Amino acid sequence: MVLNGMPITMPVPMPVPMPVPSPPATKSRVAIDWDINDSKMPSVGEFDDFNDWSNGHCRLIYSVQSDEARKHASGWAMRNTNNHNVNILKKSCLGVLLCSAKCKLPNGASVHLRPAICDKARRKQQGKQCPNRNCNGRLEIQACRGHCGYPVTHFWRRDGNGIYFQAKGTHDHPRPEAKGSTEARRLLAGGRRVRSLAVMLARESALSDKLSSLRPTKRQAKTQSIQESKRRRMGASDVLETKQELVVPPTTYLPTSTPTHSTNFNQSQGSYVPAGQGSVISQWNREIHYETEDPCYANGMYSYDMLHSPLSAHSSTGSYYQENKPQQLQHSQYQQQLSPQQHVPVSYDPSQPISSSLQCGMPSYEICDDTSSLTSSSGYCSEDYGYYNGYLPNSLDVSNGSQSQNLSQDASFYTTSSEIFSVFESTLNGGGTSGVDLIYDEATAYQQHQQQGTFPHLTNYQQEPQDQMQSADYYYSNTGVDNSWNIQMDATYHPVNSTDPIYC
């Protein structure tokens, strides 16, 4: 074309790719007229070959030996449709998936994918990106309208030795890709997804292994914390035991009531001073005293100097004696071994240890009868038979070698009870004389037996005081535990001297 003397090149229109047209109608080799809805199907001896892309109005008879015919297979995307006749299977065409941009593949073919049978999956296919990498189009469905505006319909029926197929309508859309190729592509895509998933799992496993190596698990951490706290507690207990072994406890005193005779009565003073430097709160007036002298009692409530009694710790809080430590027990045993060979000293030393035979007072197997009456002494009391030395003068006390060495202190005595102070307080403080003298006949006999069997070397020291003290007509006995009194009579009482001191 020439315009104003200049040739003009006309643009050549680009060819638009057209979908592959449907094949022509399929013809059967069996020239028999029949319909799928007939009550009786004709019998034939020759069968047609299986055709995946049957198109148009056609009737085909397949052999029962054909696998594709038994599966009702077809190249077209067909789905099952409801049918009123249970003997006839009805299927309808779903069309084809095409690219909205009408793109061409490198091999010159157009994009025509097979639609999914499931409605939900088919809806997902619509609007997806075109599988062609060089195309920005979207997939869309071209529906089949080849049967009077409705999808092409296929009918399948099995009767006798043949499978009868009948199609109604002609497909107005290109062929979709074959079912086999679609499945192959899906398998390939699935393999890629599986490989990607395997890579992701491998990476996640490596990451979890690294995290596990960097930090212990929760259970391991809890176990380690429990073991650590247990080791800490054990270490603390070991340190505490070591400290307790290193610390030497101070000398402690247990309460007894061992008064010595005194002529002064003063209730305003009463304090105990332990050995060594320390402070003690008075149990009478709550005053604190700091002393460094030997343990002793000042003039107390009853104006008696308290000696260290070898008796039980359950009688009174008025006096104290030292508990036997291992060193003191060894010293006591050593003193007992030397006592038969040594002479009795003149003075009594209260700081000497107590004999191990009477270190705890009343033994655990002794029982005290708290039901004894004033007119009967039938109730057994351990002090009536075992602790006779508590009511005897110091000269008659042979329970301990170190404590039976004072022959001149006849006025002092031991007792295991403090209740006697409140009952006979006037007598102890220098009251009127009486014929009551606390001497036990059983104690005397027991003492003589012990002197002959265990302490033969003290017989000459004890004989004269015993003869002098057998002078009681009746006496009172108090167990020191139940505050009950027993009265016993002695017909052989002959007073020796009315001026002798009275002991309760």
From Swiss-Prot:
<dbReference type="InterPro" id="IPR036115">
    <property type="entry name" value="GCM_dom_sf"/>
</dbReference>
<dbReference type="InterPro" id="IPR003902">
    <property type="entry name" value="Tscrpt_reg_GCM"/>
</dbReference>
<protein>
    <recommendedName>
        <fullName>Transcription factor glial cells missing</fullName>
    </recommendedName>
</protein>
<dbReference type="GO" id="GO:0042690">
    <property type="term" value="P:negative regulation of crystal cell differentiation"/>
</dbReference>
<dbReference type="GO" id="GO:0045687">
    <property type="term" value="P:positive regulation of glial cell differentiation"/>
</dbReference>
<dbReference type="GO" id="GO:0021782">
    <property type="term" value="P:glial cell development"/>
</dbReference>
<dbReference type="GO" id="GO:0048813">
    <property type="term" value="P:dendrite morphogenesis"/>
</dbReference>
<keyword id="KW-0238">DNA-binding</keyword>
<dbReference type="GO" id="GO:0010628">
    <property type="term" value="P:positive regulation of gene expression"/>
</dbReference>
<dbReference type="GO" id="GO:0007516">
    <property type="term" value="P:hemocyte development"/>
</dbReference>
<keyword id="KW-0805">Transcription regulation</keyword>
<feature type="compositionally biased region" description="Polar residues">
    <location>
        <begin position="313"/>
        <end position="325"/>
    </location>
</feature>
<dbReference type="GO" id="GO:0006357">
    <property type="term" value="P:regulation of transcription by RNA polymerase II"/>
</dbReference>
<dbReference type="GO" id="GO:0000981">
    <property type="term" value="F:DNA-binding transcription factor activity, RNA polymerase II-specific"/>
</dbReference>
<dbReference type="GO" id="GO:0001228">
    <property type="term" value="F:DNA-binding transcription activator activity, RNA polymerase II-specific"/>
</dbReference>
<dbReference type="GO" id="GO:0007403">
    <property type="term" value="P:glial cell fate determination"/>
</dbReference>
<dbReference type="GO" id="GO:0060252">
    <property type="term" value="P:positive regulation of glial cell proliferation"/>
</dbReference>
<feature type="DNA-binding region" description="GCM">
    <location>
        <begin position="32"/>
        <end position="188"/>
    </location>
</feature>
<feature type="region of interest" description="Disordered">
    <location>
        <begin position="214"/>
        <end position="237"/>
    </location>
</feature>
<dbReference type="GO" id="GO:0042387">
    <property type="term" value="P:plasmatocyte differentiation"/>
</dbReference>
<dbReference type="InterPro" id="IPR039791">
    <property type="entry name" value="GCM"/>
</dbReference>
<dbReference type="GO" id="GO:0000977">
    <property type="term" value="F:RNA polymerase II transcription regulatory region sequence-specific DNA binding"/>
</dbReference>
<dbReference type="InterPro" id="IPR043021">
    <property type="entry name" value="GCM_small"/>
</dbReference>
<dbReference type="GO" id="GO:0031290">
    <property type="term" value="P:retinal ganglion cell axon guidance"/>
</dbReference>
<dbReference type="GO" id="GO:0045893">
    <property type="term" value="P:positive regulation of DNA-templated transcription"/>
</dbReference>
<dbReference type="GO" id="GO:0030182">
    <property type="term" value="P:neuron differentiation"/>
</dbReference>
<dbReference type="GO" id="GO:0003677">
    <property type="term" value="F:DNA binding"/>
</dbReference>
<keyword id="KW-0539">Nucleus</keyword>
<dbReference type="GO" id="GO:0050764">
    <property type="term" value="P:regulation of phagocytosis"/>
</dbReference>
<dbReference type="GO" id="GO:0045610">
    <property type="term" value="P:regulation of hemocyte differentiation"/>
</dbReference>
<keyword id="KW-0804">Transcription</keyword>
<dbReference type="GO" id="GO:0045944">
    <property type="term" value="P:positive regulation of transcription by RNA polymerase II"/>
</dbReference>
<dbReference type="GO" id="GO:0010001">
    <property type="term" value="P:glial cell differentiation"/>
</dbReference>
<dbReference type="InterPro" id="IPR043020">
    <property type="entry name" value="GCM_large"/>
</dbReference>
<dbReference type="GO" id="GO:0060857">
    <property type="term" value="P:establishment of glial blood-brain barrier"/>
</dbReference>
<dbReference type="Pfam" id="PF03615">
    <property type="entry name" value="GCM"/>
</dbReference>
<dbReference type="GO" id="GO:0035165">
    <property type="term" value="P:embryonic crystal cell differentiation"/>
</dbReference>
<keyword id="KW-0217">Developmental protein</keyword>
<dbReference type="GO" id="GO:0005634">
    <property type="term" value="C:nucleus"/>
</dbReference>
<dbReference type="GO" id="GO:0000978">
    <property type="term" value="F:RNA polymerase II cis-regulatory region sequence-specific DNA binding"/>
</dbReference>
<dbReference type="GO" id="GO:0035289">
    <property type="term" value="P:posterior head segmentation"/>
</dbReference>
<dbReference type="GO" id="GO:0042063">
    <property type="term" value="P:gliogenesis"/>
</dbReference>
